[in-house]
A protein has these predicted regions:
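Short flexible coil/turn linkers enriched for glycine and charged/polar residues
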Residues: 145-149, 159-160, 256, 266, ...
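Hydrophobic, well-ordered secondary-structure elements that form the walls
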Residues: 262, 303, 323, 331, ...
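Contiguous mid-protein beta-loop-alpha structural module that forms a pocket-lining wall or clamp
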Residues: 311, 326-328
Length: 439
């Protein structure tokens, strides 16, 4: 039994870097601490406990993690500092040496943080607790809301793909998942708490079922039957795991939205092979075509990495032309970052930082062009929009089913409500459409 009396009336701050999955897991950590008697520190209040959930997808992510730790140590003198997440799993010794860090928890340990916090006293030096990647077995459930309107439901963790540029399998372990029954129950609980929208999160969610003998399609169908949840979004799914069966089901689903996020990474078959991706451009293009065939107005986001080792100028031009021809909505562009221990380091051709920047800027410009064209096609239409809680100012925003961001005049009564909105022209920044509520 853990003695939780030491946690009573203590305060905590939380800092999360990286993906939606990390935000979901931080929320679960916060829930564990709340149940032990810890409250979230108010703005400007010195905290007794600092939780940092880290990312390690790039070298820049590592740097941001270190900066965040230093900043929190300075802002909250005397606080017990706990660092977890991918950077903590990959470099526990380095993190433990950072001045002010008390406890470092790996992927397997973060769900049990109370037992590692002990008496909640500062340590002489950081203590690291991790498990070898090959021995990471547990699946820690997480369904978070926090200060976000939508819920994030963790359905899967880990990855078995071992792409040549990526350290995530080493940080997260092998693919594993919750049971459909447990995930449906979490969705029902979210609905009971007033949730209208759930985003399915994971590392490789299309690989769902490895540890339970179920399939992602089975999960989609089961969640679609949960009463009270009006919208589901699939956060990201590998193209080779996005079956025509899933696409067709979403097109006629009650609650799964016409919104997909699909990692391409490169539009060059040669580079995809160097990356050890499990598809080629022909398969990727066929998935986009299938989506648009049955859902012409679907929003499709695509991940692209520029400047990977082996990406010659010719291969990039080939990739650019392929992406230019795809009927997609938005590009999420990342510059390749060298990661220790990856197979990509054995590839000879190295792209200069200047070339990476130029390629990134070209793709970002293309993305902007595609997104604005997609938004413009919907001007003048009336569409249901799920409104999100207003922030400071005269405007609040929400999203259509196909993920168009819409701004309307602020009205707190509209928070978490689905209302019909007439879509007008772009806002001044060009980041949303101005809307008028019609009901």
């Amino acid at each position: 039994m853990i003695d939780t009396t030491v946690f009573q009336d203590k305060t905590a701050v939380y800092y999360t870097l990286g993906c939606k999955l990390n935000f979901s897991e931080t929320s679960t950590i916060g829930k564990i601490l709340r149940e032990a008697g810890v409250r979230t520190a108010r703005k400007g209040e010195k905290a007794d406990l600092c939780i940092v959930n880290t990312c390690s997808v790039t070298e820049m992510a590592d740097k941001k993690c270190r900066q965040a730790i230093h900043r929190l140590v300075k802002q909250h003198p005397g606080a017990v500092v706990v660092v977890t997440g991918c950077y903590a799993q990959l470099k526990p010794g380095d993190v433990a040496k950072i001045e002010g860090v008390d406890v470092v928890l790996g992927a397997e340990q973060k769900k049990d943080l109370l037992q590692y916090l002990g008496d909640l006293h500062k340590h002489e030096g950081g203590e690291a607790y991790t498990t070898a990647t090959k021995d990471i077995r547990s699946f820690a459930p997480s369904c978070s809301r926090g200060d976000r309107t939508r819920f994030f439901l963790k359905v899967q963790d880990g990855c078995d793909y071992f792409c040549s540029y990526c350290t995530i399998p080493f940080a997260r372990g092998r693919s594993r998942n919750g049971t459909i029954a447990s995930l449906v129950e979490q969705a029902r609980q979210a609905a009971a708490e007033g949730g209208k929208e759930i985003v399915l999160t994971g590392v490789n969610i299309g690989d769902f079922g490895k540890s339970t003998g179920e399939t992602f399609f089975d999960l989609v169908k089961a969640l679609d039957r949960v009463e009270g949840i009006e919208r589901y979004r699939i956060s990201s799914i590998e193209p080779n795991l996005l079956t025509d069966e899933i696409i067709e089901y979403v097109s006629r689903s009650r609650s799964f939205m016409p919104h997909f996020h699909i990692p391409l990474q490169s539009g060059s078959d040669e580079v995809l092979q160097l990356m050890r991706r499990r598809y080629g451009t022909e398969l990727f293009a066929s998935k986009i075509a299938k989506i648009k065939e049955v859902m012409p107005d679907a929003f499709i986001g695509v991940d692209v990495i520029v400047g990977t080792r082996g990406e010659t100028a010719g291969y990039f031009e080939k990739a650019y032309e392929f992406i230019h021809g795809l009927d997609v909505t938005q590009l999420h562009v990342f510059s390749y970052s060298e990661r220790p221990g990856t197979q990509a380091l054995k590839i000879d051709h190295v792209v200069t930082p200047e070339e990476k920047h130029q390629r990134s800027q070209r793709l970002l410009a293309l993305s902007d062009e595609k997104t604005k064209a997609f938004y413009a096609r919907h001007i003048g239409q009336t569409m249901p929009v799920l409104m999100e809680k207003p922030k400071a100012g005269a405007l609040m925003h929400g999203f259509t089913a196909n993920y168009i961001r819409v701004e309307v005049e602020s009205d707190a009564a509209l928070d978490n409500k689905v209302v019909n909105v007439l879509l007008g022209d772009f806002n001044e920044e060009g980041t949303a459409l101005k809307g008028t509520i019609t009901q």
